[in-house]
């Protein structure tokens, strides 16, 4: 028995194990890339000198800066909590794939809001974008593994669900290393 061999409890036609199953699993698993990326980049972003300069953190005291940082991170977690709750409703009434599409769109809107934030506009866009991104991430982290496990044949179900975790870790790596590249060179 090899590492990629299939173990079946009942015979399944070979036509079931086609590229479509793997492609659907990979696409649904790619939802985890946004989860890993958004979770990873914020810590190093808050520490970047360019971020602190843009939002005038130097004018604030240490306690105020710590409070702002905690609020920026917490908004995302609060959104993820409610996104995970709303995911059940979306999955029940709309289905898993439509729910994934909706929560991914919510994430994109949140990311666009954060992209539009600058020192002149203040942190409001970042707070709102973090909440929406959290809702999208919470919904996708709930729906993607369920969707993948439902579409995959039993013999390769674990392999396909691992695509979700792989996407999460790839997103985390990208999120951390992009900010390392943005650090000022000394």
Task: Give names to the regions the model predicted.
Residues 1-186:
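Transmembrane-helix signature of 12-pass secondary carriers
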């Amino acid at each position: 028995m090899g590492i990629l061999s299939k173990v079946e409890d009942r015979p399944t036609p070979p036509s079931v194990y086609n590229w479509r199953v793997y492609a659907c699993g990979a696409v649904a698993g790619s939802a985890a890339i946004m989860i890993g990326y958004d979770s990873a980049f914020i810590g190093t972003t808050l520490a970047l000198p360019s971020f602190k300069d843009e939002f005038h953190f130097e004018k604030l005291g240490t306690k105020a800066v710590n409070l702002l940082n905690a609020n920026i991170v917490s908004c995302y977690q609060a959104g993820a909590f409610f996104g995970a709750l709303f995911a059940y409703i979306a999955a029940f009434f709309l289905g898993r794939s439509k729910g994934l599409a909706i929560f991914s769109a919510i994430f994109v809107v949140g990311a666009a809001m954060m992209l539009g934030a600058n020192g002149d506009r203040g942190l409001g866009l970042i707070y709102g974008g973090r909440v929406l991104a959290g809702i999208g991430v919470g919904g996708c982290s709930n729906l993607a593994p369920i969707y993948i496990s439902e579409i995959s044949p039993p013999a390769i179900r674990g392999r396909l669900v691992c695509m979700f975790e792989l996407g999460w870790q790839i997103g985390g790596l990208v999120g951390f290393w992009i900010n390392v590249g943005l650090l000022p060179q000394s």
